[in-house]
């Protein structure tokens, strides 16, 4: 009888421990509201991805954690948003991964022209050890890399003339992301690069301060560049992953359960956002044509010429990050075997 009583008591204590542990786990998640800064407007796949991210965070936290989205660059330029994130006044920023080269030089690799042959290659690299290693380097700069989303393959637009061959680019004043490699490749094509924050781009195109720009189709449509640009050339010259980054200053105040909610939600939203982006591409081109854009596409021979003209740019910019270039090429080599 005594033995039975002891077993019953032990079982009761074990059940109580499990129950209390479950309650404690649920109570670990506290109420939070986080701001999310994005450059693109509502309706763009990245903002749709942000909406899914917010939905997932709310669901996984039982409604305790909330993401407030600020699309369209209303919280400032990418550079200003990163600075605010480092200071802890903005918690989350979604931005072109290459822009982070101003913080960690290795991120310049993501702006190398003709790096990825297709989106499948890009996914494998950024989701694998290479991409995670680069995101880990952000911590020393006050940022936590949660996931990679997608902006996509970049195309060229301008208001001057159709682009059918490499020589057509010569003399065009093209807005570029403010970093060295983008300035260099436009110069290599005899164009005139104009570094400019994305939030200033539409007005610069409208006022003819620049002749053209280069961005994925989704960006061209969502930001209505067709209103101020007549010619679109399909060049696929660069693929842009997007980094979802979190303020380390705020991250360090979160507990393990809260961090897991954010990390899991960011990863799930990545798969969703990439699919939305890729599903939209064909329809986006049709919409741009209907909006009046004249579309041209580089032939295989012209694309080969474009690659050749950019090789010295890749060599020059690779000298500053030799180990990163070596690791990237090794990853791509494995994927292509």
Q: Each predicted region: which residue ranges?
A:
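Bacterial N-terminal signal peptides
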Residues: 10-20
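N-terminal secretory/targeting leader peptides
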Residues: 13, 27-121, 129-132, 136-337
